[in-house]
Amino acid sequence: ASGLFFAVDPGANASLGGMASTRASGTAAVRYGTMRETVMGLTVVTPDGRIVRTGTRARKSASGLDLTRLYVGSEGLLGIITEVQLRLFGLPEHVVAAVCQFGSLRAAMDTVIATLQLGVPVARIELLNDVQMDACIRYSKLDEFEARPTLFIEFHGSESAVAEQVATVEALALDNGGSGFRYAHQPEDRSRLWKARHSCYHANLAMHPGWSSMGTDACVPISALVECITETEAAIRESGLYAPIVGHVGDGNFHLGIIYDDTDPTARRKAEALAEDVALRAIRLGGTCTGEHGVGLHRIGQIEIEHGEAIELMRDIKRALDPRGIMNPGKMLQM
């Protein structure tokens, strides 16, 4: 559709069905929301072969149970999604990206929190720690930057609104000891920055060729973000592992890319222990073990801790809709 865009900024290998099934998110979720808010309706094939249409084109509805939300994030346990009806957004009149670097991770996070508390409608605000920036500089040739804690920020709106947003956030960054903004006004310059951000996974692997990556997906309330990331950095140091931090911190979501030698059983155990530590810390602080990647096989035990007795209700729903257990067995829920 002319003049519209899909705001849930997909990763390189994403599919719409997969994004709906895992309730995925992305760099623009802080302003535009996740797949939960973006999916308006679905066509689903149920385990008994019925083809069911959920949702309407209306922006809101108080009619019946919200089956769309039931299926979004269900990871194929309750049916197969064959069609997705999406909400699109108008292309912003003006777009500016900026990069700001800091002397400490705490200063960068304080800038994020102050920005959100003031209600500045940033379109994206991404945090990369010094280790992650070092990998990105080497892999994506970002030679104009230093290996320091960094925020990648993007602003959308009218020209005057964007100018006001930029001035507010830059002042907050300077108050926290940040560098002046480096701007990317042209589409090709913005694309270069966001391509580097999306290439973090490959940048991390390039630091240790032949090794494997184990990801984490913790998401916590903004009020717990500083505590969670600070404790996580300490855990990384204690582990001795190479594990850069990058995150969509505008909604409290951050990732570790734990790079380890998969041929070394000790290294794998240490990587698994660190990933488990991050997930359990997020849960303890009122967050979740997975903000956008989903549960799959590896987080089954973690969501049982996170949801407690509610897990049994989830199992009841699974049994009611799929009594023979034919839909994606063994994933998400231990039946």
Identify the meaning behind each predicted range.
Residues 1-126, 327:
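FAD-binding subdomain of flavoenzyme oxidoreductases
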Residues 1-6, 40-61, 223-227, 262-273, ...:
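A short, flexible low-complexity segment enriched in Lys/Arg and Gly/Pro that occurs
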Residues 11, 184-185, 329-332:
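Short coil/turn segments at secondary-structure boundaries
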Residues 50, 300-335:
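Activity-critical C-terminal alpha-helical subdomain
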Residues 76, 256, 322:
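Conserved, mostly hydrophobic/aromatic
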Residues 86-90, 96-274, 281, 285:
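C-terminal substrate-recognition/cap domain of FAD-linked oxidoreductases
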Residues 131-132, 249-253, 294-301, 335:
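Small/polar glycine-rich anion-binding or flexible loop at a beta-alpha turn
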Residues 283-295, 308, 323-327:
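Alpha-helix capping/hinge segments and adjacent helical runs
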